[in-house]
Amino acid sequence: MRGLTKEHNWQNATIMAMASMTAYKDLGAFQKQFDPEAVLFDVDGTQVYCWNDGAIACVAFRGTEPTQWSDIKADLKIRRVKCPTGFVHRGFRDALNEVWDNVSKWLSAQKKEHVFFTGHSLGGALATLAA
């Protein structure tokens, strides 16, 4: 799927919402829907898809899967921990840290001026922190 633009608009919102939904599927399904060269990083139960849509690098975090203990554990680590700009939910911080090295290396290699982040549930929290 191609069609993202650099502006904030309904088309972009729809595409990124679809990516949030498709992030619950396997890599083959994600590649078929968005980009045959999309990659999946799956580290200690945190999953994130990265792909390109023209001049825009895109990152979609998978949300909580109720059958996955690692997701439930991340959601339940509710104690706040200090970060440079305030406080953050410990489970969300830990889950993002699990995949961030892979995501940041992938983003650096893309050399894109624009990056879009998305996710649902736990994935939405990770997308917010990543942005």
Task: Tell where the protein language model's regions lie, with residue ranges.
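Charged, compositionally biased non-catalytic regions
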Residues: 1-31
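A conserved cap/lid and substrate-binding interface adjacent to the catalytic center
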Residues: 22-118, 129
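Active-site loop->helix "elbow" adjoining a glycine-rich segment at hydrolase catalytic centers
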Residues: 121-126
